[in-house]
């Protein structure tokens, strides 16, 4: 999928770019697989902001994606490739032989009319889903489970891919897109191939308004605030932050400080930290 650059007709289009949507084969979503989604806008159940810089954005219908691929040994045919406003990857509508329809993440190379299947005995082909124990070393996979039966949780963003680098006992070592090497049970399932829309990372929004369409609000620097609002605030003119190292609005170390808990359960499963 190619990137289309705007002509410099206005300041908002001068540096903007969009994808050409050449892979899309159908515009309207499957009605039975959509639902109304009221976004939290960064608030918790009490209405308190727990994630800053979220809010607004265009209304969206949620597309129910089948991350679990739980219909085992039932072949499915790819009907359409569609746009999903809730993620940067494309989605594919598949029709199972028993008449059921599902959405899955669209991997690179999967075409309309192809047949895919989730089965321990499936071939190593794009879009097929298998347990890690059945997938050979060096294979590129995505939509990986963390626990057997939990549904895919790892490697779901556009253009991402993980690689199986080793197997020992009941564990498989995966190199994730972040560079982290992690152990995952060989009973977990994964889908063959790389997630599609690999050029999504190279897009330039071009103007602040496109961020607002996505539900992203302005990220104000702490040094531009008053002392009552942020530890970096205050001072005359462009003053330094007045501290040895930067901190968050709540006084915790920020901008480079490691925040992962040392005694986290999954620490034993991480063989190499992310880069």
Swiss-Prot record:
Any GO BP: mitochondrial translation
The keyword Transit peptide is assigned to this record: no
Domain of life the protein comes from: Eukaryota
Family note: Belongs to the universal ribosomal protein uL2 family.
Entry keywords, A to Z: Chloroplast, Plastid, Ribonucleoprotein, Ribosomal protein
Region of interest (Disordered), residue spans: 222-258
UniProt xrefs under Gene3D superfamilies: 2.30.30.30, Nucleic acid-binding proteins (2.40.50.140), Ribosomal protein L2, domain 3 (4.10.950.10)
UniProt keyword DNA repair, yes or no: no
The protein's name in its UniProt record: Large ribosomal subunit protein uL2c
